[in-house]
C-alpha cells in the first residue's frame, strides 16, 4: 500500500461496514424462512404463509427504491457523509424489529426499513468512495462495496446455521455502532465540498485522503489534483449564475448517453439471473445428488460469491472494468446454458446420471463469474461515468431502475419458472447475459486508470460521432 492511499483505504473500509451489515440483512432470510414456514415457527399465528413470505422478500425492493430517491436527493443537499450516518437509523430499527418480531407484520416493516437503508448504501457508498479515491486505486476501492456485501451475506448464512434467528441481529447492531464511531470523524468528500464552493474545506479534506495533513509543502501531484477541482468548480460557477439543476442538465446528448448506459448496467446486474438463481440453491444441489442441507448449500454459495468479488478487487485495475464485465457476462451466460441443458434433458427423460456433476459445476460458474464482474462493477462504473453536477440524481435514478428490476424478479420469477420451468428461465438469463456483454463491448467506455475528467471527455467525444 502506497503511503498516499492509507486513509483512502481506511475510509473505504469504514464506509463498507454499512455494506457488510446490509449484506447480512439481505442474507438473513436464507435460514430464517425455513424456520418460519416449519411447524417450529416461533410466531403466535404459527407458520407463515407463502404470500407472507413473498411480501417479506419483495418489500425490501420497494424500501430500496424509496431509499434511493430520498437519499439521492439528500446527498445533493447535505453531502455524502451525513446521509450515510442518517442511513444507520432505519438499519438499526429494522434489526430491532427482527429481534422483537411476533408475526409477519413486524418482519415486513423490518424488511422495508432495511431496504430503505440499503437504497442509501448502494447510492452513497459508491459516490463517497469514488470521490475520495485516486485514479490508480479507484477501481479496487470501488469494488469493495460488493465484496463486503457478500461477506455480510456469508456471515448471515453461517450465523443462521449456528445461531437462533433473533440472536444474530445483535452482532450486526454492534457493527453498525462501530461504523458510527469510526465514520463520524472522517471528512466529507473533497469533490462535494468544492462543488458546494467550500474551497478551504475541500483542500483540507483532500489533504487528509492523500495523507498530506502534516506536510506544509505538498507535492506537485496534489497541487495538480487541487487545480483540477478548482477548474471544475470555477467552470461551473462562471458558466451559470445558479448552480441549481435544470432539465437541460439531463436533456443533452452526454447525459442521455450516461443514463442509458447506467440503466443497461443495472439491467445486466439483475437479469444476469444470479440473485434469482440463489433461491434455487437447494434444488440444484439436490438434483446433483448432494446430501448437504439447504443451509450448508447457502454457505458454499456465499463462499463462492465472496471469492469472486475478491478476484474483482485484484483484477479491476489490471484487466480493466470493460474486459472484466464482458468476460463475466459471457461466463455467467455459459453457466446458465450448461445448467439449462442439463435440466431440459432431465425433463425429456434422458439418462443424465453420468452428468450429475454438471449442475453444481454450472451453478458455481454462474455465481463465480457474476461475482467478479456483472454483480460488482456496475455501481462503481456508474459513478465514474456520470458528470459531477448530475451525479447524485443520475445515480439515484439508475438505482431506482435497479430496485424495480429486482422487485420484478423477486415477485414474479417463481411464476415464470412455474410456466417455463427452470431450464426456460435459464435460457432467458443466458440471452440477457450475452446481450449485456455485446452492449458493454459497443457502448461502455473503459475507465481504468483514467481521471473522472478524462472519462467524461471521452464520452463527449464518442457522443459527437
What is the predicted function of each stretch?
Residues 225-226, 230-235:
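Cytosol/matrix-facing amphipathic helices and coiled-coil assembly/linker segments
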Residues 209-224:
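Short intracellular "coupling" helices and adjacent cytoplasmic loop segments at the cytosolic face
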Amino acid at each position: 500500500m502506497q503511503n498516499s492511499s492509507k486513509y483512502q483505504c481506511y475510509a473505504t473500509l469504514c464506509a463498507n461496514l454499512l455494506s457488510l451489515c446490509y449484506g447480512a440483512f439481505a442474507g438473513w432470510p436464507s435460514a430464517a424462512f425455513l424456520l418460519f414456514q416449519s411447524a417450529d415457527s416461533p410466531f403466535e399465528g404459527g407458520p407463515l404463509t407463502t404470500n407472507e413470505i413473498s411480501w417479506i422478500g419483495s418489500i425490501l425492493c420497494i424500501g430500496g427504491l424509496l431509499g434511493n430517491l430520498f437519499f439521492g436527493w439528500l446527498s445533493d443537499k447535505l453531502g455524502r457523509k451525513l446521509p450515510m450516518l442518517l442511513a444507520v437509523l432505519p438499519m438499526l430499527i429494522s434489526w430491532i424489529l427482527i429481534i422483537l418480531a411476533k408475526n409477519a407484520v413486524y418482519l415486513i416493516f423490518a424488511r422495508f426499513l432495511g431496504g430503505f437503508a440499503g437504497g442509501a448504501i448502494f447510492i452513497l457508498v459508491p459516490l463517497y468512495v469514488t470521490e475520495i479515491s485516486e485514479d490508480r486505486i479507484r477501481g479496487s476501492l470501488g469494488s469493495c462495496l460488493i465484496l463486503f456485501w457478500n461477506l455480510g451475506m456469508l456471515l448471515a448464512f453461517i450465523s443462521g446455521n449456528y445461531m437462533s434467528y433473533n440472536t444474530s441481529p445483535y452482532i450486526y447492531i454492534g457493527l453498525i455502532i462501530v461504523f458510527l464511531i469510526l465514520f463520524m470523524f472522517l471528512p466529507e468528500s473533497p469533490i462535494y465540498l468544492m462543488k458546494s464552493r467550500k474551497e478551504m474545506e475541500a483542500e483540507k479534506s483532500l489533504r487528509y485522503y492523500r495523507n498530506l495533513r502534516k506536510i506544509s509543502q505538498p507535492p506537485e501531484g496534489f497541487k495538480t489534483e487541487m487545480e483540477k477541482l478548482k477548474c471544475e468548480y470555477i467552470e461551473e460557477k462562471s458558466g451559470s449564475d445558479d448552480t441549481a439543476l435544470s432539465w437541460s442538465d439531463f436533456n443533452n446528448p452526454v447525459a442521455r448517453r450516461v443514463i442509458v448506459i447506467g440503466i443497461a448496467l443495472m439491467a445486466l446486474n439483475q437479469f444476469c439471473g444470479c440473485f434469482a438463481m440463489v433461491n434455487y440453491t437447494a434444488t440444484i444441489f439436490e438434483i446433483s445428488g448432494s446430501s448437504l442441507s439447504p443451509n450448508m448449500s447457502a454457505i458454499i454459495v456465499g463462499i463462492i460469491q465472496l471469492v469472486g468479488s475478491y478476484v474483482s478487487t485484484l483484477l479491476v485495475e489490471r484487466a480493466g472494468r470493460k474486459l472484466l464485465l464482458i468476460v463475466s457476462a459471457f461466463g455467467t451466460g455459459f453457466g446458465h446454458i450448461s445448467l439449462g441443458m442439463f435440466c431440459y434433458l432431465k425433463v425429456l427423460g434422458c439418462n443424465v446420471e453420468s452428468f450429475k456433476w454438471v449442475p453444481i459445476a454450472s451453478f458455481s460458474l454462474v455465481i463465480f463469474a457474476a461475482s467478479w464482474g456483472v454483480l460488482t462493477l456496475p455501481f462503481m462504473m456508474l459513478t465514474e461515468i456520470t458528470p459531477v453536477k448530475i451525479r447524485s440524481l443520475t445515480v439515484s435514478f439508475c438505482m431506482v431502475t435497479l430496485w424495480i428490476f429486482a422487485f420484478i424478479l423477486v415477485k414474479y420469477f417463481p411464476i415464470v419458472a412455474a410456466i417455463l420451468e427452470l431450464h426456460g428461465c435459464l435460457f432467458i438469463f443466458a440471452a440477457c447475459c450475452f446481450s449485456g456483454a455485446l452492449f458493454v463491448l459497443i457502448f461502455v467506455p473503459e475507465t481504468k486508470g483514467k481521471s473522472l475528467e478524462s472519462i467524461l471527455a471521452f464520452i463527449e467525444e464518442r457522443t459527437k460521432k
